[in-house]
Amino acid sequence: MAESVIEKCTEQVSNRFKLALLASQRTHDLNTGASNPVQSARFKGHKNTIISLYEIAERQVDTHELFSLLVSRCKEYMKGNLSNTYSSNTSKLEKLLNFSNDQFNTDADVDQESTDIQDDEVENEMSNQDSEDIDDEVDNEE
């Protein structure tokens, strides 16, 4: 049964990868409530993925419209990721640049040992922030 639906779908959409993307977009629309199944009584009890494939196979949805919705959704996603990347880098830069004057000892009597300790503390803080950034990027990719 599912194989015949896929065969019908490939008659409508020649590329199987594009078919998967279009079915994904249609399923997303159904899951979010953006639209209802065209024949809701017929598909009662079916999962939205199967409903999407049936609708594509039977030409009940416009594949060109689905593709344009998919492209716009991808663009929004990329804009969100890019703005998050830039905003997080900006906030890290602000943290590094906004040290208060009390954090730096400007006395001329400071010996080299205390300066080395402060340098080590700053390097540790920067490496901790870098490791947190890597962890955040890994979490976002998952």
Swiss-Prot record:
User: Which species?
Assistant: Wolbachia sp. subsp. Brugia malayi (strain TRS)
Quote the protein name from its UniProt record.
Answer: DNA-directed RNA polymerase subunit omega
What does the UniProt keyword field contain?
A: DNA-directed RNA polymerase, Nucleotidyltransferase, Transcription, Transferase
Q: In the UniProt record, does the keyword Hydrolase occur?
A: no
| Family of the protein in this entry | Belongs to the RNA polymerase subunit omega family.
Q: Which enzyme class, named as a word?
A: transferase
| A GO-annotated cellular component | DNA-directed RNA polymerase complex
Please provide, alphabetically and separated by semicolons, the GO molecular function terms listed in this UniProt record.
DNA binding; DNA-directed RNA polymerase activity
- Quaternary form? The RNAP catalytic core consists of 2 alpha, 1 beta, 1 beta' and 1 omega subunit. When a sigma factor is associated with the core the holoenzyme is formed, which can initiate transcription.
